[in-house]
């Protein structure tokens, strides 16, 4: 029941603000946006299955954000990271890589749903799957040749190739950003002290906590940023993450978290807050070029 246009605008606004803050305050190459897994929990579990309003769900996200701020100030989140064994920290980065790969294969329909085996190989001879394979080959060649911006070039080339394939659908170039007013500061405090609210907040807290920790450890490991088993300026990164979640709820979006696609920037050499800062600015630009960016097929980014 949420306004789609308002959701688009608020997602871009909060992602841009949080990512820029990560670059300026934490000085780390991590980008933030509403997490897809938590988005699914917000929409399907809380609203559709449990039957609560989206205003109720936003209230739960807001409370979760406040708790995260408290846990960050008291260094609880840092202590959790410290007690994770070194071998597990390294394996987390591997797991995140596999997770990203699976998302990409699924988006490109190379891996599809199967009732008997859960997943199976899709039709690789046409459509998004074939386009994705072409994109993988193009991007791989560029990466091997160490071409600057290899992944970006690969996405652009794959998008253009997708036009004759009928996969890329051009939607225009520029549009005026929709207003965020329909979902701004829309909370429901009537059931704040109910057992259901406690369960939902705890679930959001638990998933977001380990999602963020796993992403930070995995991407930082890939970037070679971990010194003596510790991530530099970790507390600042956690604080940005907590503030983003709280602010995101106020603006009308689900839990904002550091997302695994940050690995793409690291892979291209990003090691400082400048990476996050530029990414945040690109988020703002995309607000006005939404039709153009929405023309990029998932097979090209997969």
Report each predicted region and the residues it spans.
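Structural motif marking the loop-to-transmembrane transition
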Residues: 5-9, 51-55, 59, 85, ...
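Transmembrane helix-loop junctions in multipass membrane proteins, especially transporters and channels
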Residues: 27-31, 76-77, 111-115, 144, ...
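Membrane-helix interface "capping/anchor" motifs
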Residues: 20-34, 141-152, 267-273
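Hydrophobic core segments of alpha-helical transmembrane domains in multi-pass membrane transport
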Residues: 14-23, 44, 62-72, 93-108, ...
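Inter-helical loop and helix-membrane interface segments of multi-pass membrane transporters/permeases
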Residues: 1-3, 44-57, 78-91, 98-141, ...
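Short, amphipathic, aromatic/basic-enriched membrane-interface segments that mark the entry/exit
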Residues: 1-7, 25-31, 118-128, 265-275, ...
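Helix-loop-helix junctions within the multi-pass membrane cores of secondary transporters/permeases
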Residues: 14-15, 24, 35-93, 219-302
């Amino acid at each position: 029941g949420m306004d789609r246009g308002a959701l688009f605008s608020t997602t871009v606004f909060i992602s841009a603000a949080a990512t820029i803050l990560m670059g300026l305050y934490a000085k780390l190459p991590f980008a933030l946006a509403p997490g897809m897994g938590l988005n699914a929990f917000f929409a399907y579990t809380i609203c559709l299955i449990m039957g609560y309003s989206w205003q109720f769900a936003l209230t739960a996200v807001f409370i979760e954000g406040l708790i995260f701020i408290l846990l960050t100030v008291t260094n609880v989140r840092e202590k959790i990271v410290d007690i994770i064994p070194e071998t597990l920290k390294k394996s987390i980065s591997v797991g995140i890589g596999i997770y990203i790969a699976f998302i990409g294969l699924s988006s490109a329909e190379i891996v599809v749903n199967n009732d008997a085996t859960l997943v199976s190989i899709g039709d690789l001879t046409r459509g998004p799957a074939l386009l994705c394979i072409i994109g993988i080959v193009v991007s791989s060649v560029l990466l091997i040749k160490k071409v600057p911006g290899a992944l970006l070039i690969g996405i652009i080339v794959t998008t253009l190739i997708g036009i004759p394939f009928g996969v890329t659908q051009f939607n225009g170039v520029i549009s005026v950003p929709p207003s965020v007013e329909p979902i701004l500061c829309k909370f429901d405090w009537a059931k704040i002290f109910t057992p259901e609210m406690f369960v939902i907040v705890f679930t959001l807290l638990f998933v977001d906590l380990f999602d963020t920790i796993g992403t930070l450890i995995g991407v930082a490991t890939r970037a070679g940023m971990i010194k003596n088993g510790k991530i530099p300026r970790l507390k600042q990164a956690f604080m940005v993450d907590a503030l983003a979640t709280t602010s995101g709820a106020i603006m009308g979006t689900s839990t904002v978290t550091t997302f695994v696609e940050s690995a793409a920037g690291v892979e291209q050499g990003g090691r400082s807050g400048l990476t996050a800062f530029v990414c945040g600015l690109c988020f703002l630009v995309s607000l006005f070029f939404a039709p153009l960016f929405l023309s990029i097929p998932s097979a090209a980014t997969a």
